[in-house]
Amino acid sequence: MKQAVIVDCIRTPMGRSKAGVFRNVRAETLSAELMKGLLLRNPQLDPNLIEDVIWGCVQQTLEQGFNIARNASLLAGIPKTAGAVTVNRLCGSSMDAIHQAARAIMTGMGDTFIIGGVEHMGHVPMSHGVDFHPGLANNVAKASGMMGLTAEMLGKLHGITREQQDAFAVRSHQRAYAATIEGRFAKEIYGIEGHDANGALIKVLQDEVIRPETTMESLAALRPVFDPVNGTVTAGTSSALSDGASAMLIMEESKARALSLPIRARIRSMAVAGCDAAIMGYGPVPATQKALARAGITVADLDVIELNEAFAAQSLPCVKDLGLADVVDDKINLNGGAIALGHPLGCSGARISTTLINLMEDKDATLGLATMCIGLGQGIATVFERV
């Protein structure tokens, strides 16, 4: 079977969704700039070789509608001979884009793909136009469509305290801020034009969402937002609302070597799994177990892990049940996560994978895992191997 490899991976800075640096920048522009960036960074690649552009996006309406993958690829000047498709696996959309490209390569259906994802949550809110079928109530509780309440449920089932959640959130901001000031995000962030608070055009080179001032005391002052009476999940222990995009150049290994392109990682295994929608945040556990089995490894073999922080209350049960509680500070989300950086839905899968690959290089690691939960009860996971 042919091997799928990551040649390059980049992301935009993460902008605040409320009056942030990308308030005047459209989702198609964020996407197109990354597509152009991949080609500029890899001049050996003839753009005419691109088979397909596979782009994750959840709210496919307004500026994100009518196949944003194609709109952005045309904006980027990618040859019209390349295909383009927008995919939606909710939070796992751009990781699913990775999987789609990898499967195509492994089965001989193309050897050069640009993949990624975007979500401009400031322009297209997560709940915009959502209308669940009334018949779903026969199988799924109404609260299962409210992600914060599913996090409350998962936290209660696993005995996760408010203090544990607050500590996890503080860690996320501290780690992300340290990664910023120490330049550890510099390799993955591709600067994008935006606007400062006064409306002046600027080149955005750092994440806007991180709050380094976050402390246990400041989080303790926040009220539960989803279950105000009995809940423990606050805005501070939930992923921030942010705008951003991520992108990868994925190729068949021998093709990349023939063009003298760098091979940053190989896709070792992939998996998706379902779980009860009421505890959607538990999805990374069965998805990871599948991916590890397919790779022929155990969780102990993993050197670095990126677990998307949708909520602290869902991340901590996954850490516990995957047997990772003792290695959090050594292996998991070493540069912070979505609580600090935000979770632009269609962007996050390729974003955490990009961060993972850079961490693997920094630590000279061999095996890494990127995994995330998905609304309405799914999980997705990818094992990467440096070669």
Swiss-Prot record:
Gene: fadA
Cleaved signal peptide residues: none
Alphabetical keyword list: Acyltransferase, Cytoplasm, Fatty acid metabolism, Lipid degradation, Lipid metabolism, Transferase
Role according to the record: Catalyzes the final step of fatty acid oxidation in which acetyl-CoA is released and the CoA ester of a fatty acid two carbons shorter is formed.
Native source organism of the sequence: Shewanella sp. (strain W3-18-1)
One of the GO biological process terms: fatty acid beta-oxidation
Name assigned to this protein: 3-ketoacyl-CoA thiolase
Taxonomic lineage from the root: Bacteria, Pseudomonadati, Pseudomonadota, Gammaproteobacteria, Alteromonadales
Entry's EC annotation: 2.3.1.16
Entry-linked PANTHER family: 3-KETOACYL-COA THIOLASE FADA (PTHR43853:SF11), 3-KETOACYL-COA THIOLASE, PEROXISOMAL (PTHR43853)
Quaternary structure and interacting proteins, as annotated: Heterotetramer of two alpha chains (FadB) and two beta chains (FadA).
Functional pathway: Lipid metabolism; fatty acid beta-oxidation
Family: Belongs to the thiolase-like superfamily. Thiolase family.
Presence of the UniProt keyword NADP in the record: no
GO molecular function, one term: acetyl-CoA C-acyltransferase activity
Subcellular location: Cytoplasm
Gene3D superfamilies the record matches: 3.40.47.10
Main location class: cytoplasm
This protein's GO CC annotations: cytoplasm
Known catalytic reactions: an acyl-CoA + acetyl-CoA = a 3-oxoacyl-CoA + CoA
Active site (record annotation): C91 (acyl-thioester intermediate), H343 (proton acceptor), C373 (proton acceptor)
InterPro entries: FadA (IPR012805), Thiolase (IPR002155), Thiolase-like (IPR016039), Thiolase-like_sf_Thiolase (IPR050215), Thiolase_acyl_enz_int_AS (IPR020615), Thiolase_AS (IPR020610), Thiolase_C (IPR020617), Thiolase_CS (IPR020613)
